[in-house]
């Protein structure tokens, strides 16, 4: 019987189903890089026909003569059976080939140290190759061999070596699977802008709103100063719906800085969770005193606009006068689907009062949440500057609060007058 054929790939590359690249009298590239023992075991392949065209010039002379002398169709070609030769002549030549291969690889360990099942054998591993076919590998590709000794103590068995190498490869090249979560941290699609840019956009929106409020306030007619002064609505038409629109703009702008006063945020707060108070920090950098005064300026202009509207209504009721048809103010229509509310004066007055009360209540809650930025470094802000800024803002808040209370009282009085006159 011929000696068992030694597989071309080392045990480590064979167990991982990788191509074994080696040259001369040294270990393969992967074993040298991992500082592992590079050993060869006998092949357990049996009766698997190899259909590879090997050049005759690359095969030893004895094998080439055997291939040319074989004329029997039942006789297999050289390389078809590497572990179980079919004739005595083949035994002699394969032994010569085995001896020549063994002499050229003195660093190969004895066969059988790492037994591998035949099911893990690849068909390309037993193809006959010579040293001329193997690529030459430079020492820089495996510095462990050039600079230091190779590990000589092999693991206990081939399965342990396979597990160690598999763990090493998994750590170097992690792969995300269905059961293994991805190692990469998720990246948010939404990129938060810098706080400075956010605050600058808020101040710009407040400034534009302040200009629009100033222009809109100029279109609302002033109420009569006394009962003796006649009242007329001619050439004094203005849009009440724009007043509501500007009020909503102020609510939305300030809500971006203080979202805890959104109605949706209140609805989403779970039961049993204490609601955040005005002392909690806003969703961005706090507004400075100048920005807080800008918010109060917008709110003051809205209060003045509403006060003019309701003062004109109160003047009409106090005089018990009947407005001519051509002097009617164009009120916005209210429509729900195909249903439209009638355009009666009483109904329009009720809608205006209710919408104004609701918007003013929401704006009042938001204004109470606006707090200036408090300096954390006492060295940067002197005591006089801090006292002056705090006094200015406190006075502005008190003034705006007084104007708000006066407007709410006017709305309540107007509603009571409409009820007494049986208009509502």
UniProtKB/Swiss-Prot annotation:
Residues 265-286 are annotated as: Disordered. It comes from the Eukaryota. GO terms for molecular function: DNA binding; DNA-binding transcription factor activity, RNA polymerase II-specific; zinc ion binding. SMART domains: GAL4. GO terms for biological process: positive regulation of metabolic process. It is found in: Nucleus. InterPro entries: Carb_Metab_Trans_Reg, Zn2-C6_fun-type_DNA-bd_sf, Zn2Cys6_DnaBD. The keyword Zinc applies. Residues 10-38 bind DNA. The keyword Nuclease does not apply. Keywords: DNA-binding, Metal-binding, Nucleus, Transcription, Transcription regulation, Zinc. One of its GO terms (cellular component) is nucleus. Transmembrane segments: none annotated. Transcription factor that regulates the expression of the gene cluster that mediates the biosynthesis of isoflavipucine. This is Isoflavipucine cluster transcription factor ATEG_00326. It comes from Aspergillus terreus (strain NIH 2624 / FGSC A1156).
């Amino acid at each position: 019987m011929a000696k068992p054929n030694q597989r071309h790939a080392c045990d480590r590359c064979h167990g991982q189903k990788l191509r074994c690249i080696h040259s001369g009298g040294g270990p393969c590239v992967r074993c040298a890089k991992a500082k592992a023992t590079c050993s060869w075991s006998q092949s357990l392949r049996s009766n698997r026909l190899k259909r590879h065209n090997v050049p005759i010039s690359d095969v030893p002379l004895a094998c080439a003569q055997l291939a040319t002398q074989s004329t029997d169709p039942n006789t297999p070609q050289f390389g078809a059976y590497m572990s179980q030769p079919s004739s005595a002549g083949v035994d002699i030549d394969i032994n010569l080939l085995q001896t020549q291969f063994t002499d050229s690889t003195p660093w190969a360990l004895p066969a059988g140290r790492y037994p591998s099942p035949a099911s893990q054998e690849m068909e390309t591993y037993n193809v006959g190759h010579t040293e001329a076919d193997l690529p030459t590998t430079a020492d820089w590709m495996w510095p462990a061999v050039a600079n230091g000794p190779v590990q000589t103590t092999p693991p206990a068995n081939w399965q342990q070596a396979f597990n160690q190498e598999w763990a090493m490869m998994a750590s170097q090249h992690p792969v995300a699977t269905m059961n293994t979560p991805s190692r990469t941290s998720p990246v948010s699609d939404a990129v938060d802008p810098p706080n400075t840019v956010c605050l600058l956009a808020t101040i710009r929106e407040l400034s534009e709103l302040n200009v629009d409020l100033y222009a809109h306030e100029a279109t609302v007619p002033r109420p009569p100063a006394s009962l003796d002064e006649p009242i007329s609505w001619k050439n004094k038409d203005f849009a009440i719906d724009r007043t509501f629109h500007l009020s909503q703009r102020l609510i939305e702008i300030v809500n971006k800085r203080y979202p805890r006063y959104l109605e949706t945020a209140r609805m989403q707060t779970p039961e049993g969770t204490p609601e955040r108070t005005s002392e909690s920090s806003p969703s961005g950098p706090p507004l400075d005193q100048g920005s807080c005064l800008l918010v109060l300026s917008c709110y003051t202009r809205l209060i003045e606009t509403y006060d003019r509207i309701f003062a004109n209504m109160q003047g009409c009721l106090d005089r018990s006068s009947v407005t001519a048809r051509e002097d009617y103010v164009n009120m916005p229509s209210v429509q729900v689907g195909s249903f439209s509310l009638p355009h009666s004066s009483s109904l329009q007055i009720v809608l205006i009062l209710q919408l104004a009360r609701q918007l003013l209540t929401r704006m009042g809650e938001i204004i109470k949440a606006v707090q200036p930025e408090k300096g954390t470094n006492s060295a940067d802000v002197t005591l006089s500057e801090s006292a002056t800024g705090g006094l200015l803002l406190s006075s502005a808040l008190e003034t705006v609060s007084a104007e708000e209370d006066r407007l709410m009282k006017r709305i309540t009085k107007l509603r009571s007058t409409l009820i007494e006159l049986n208009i509502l």
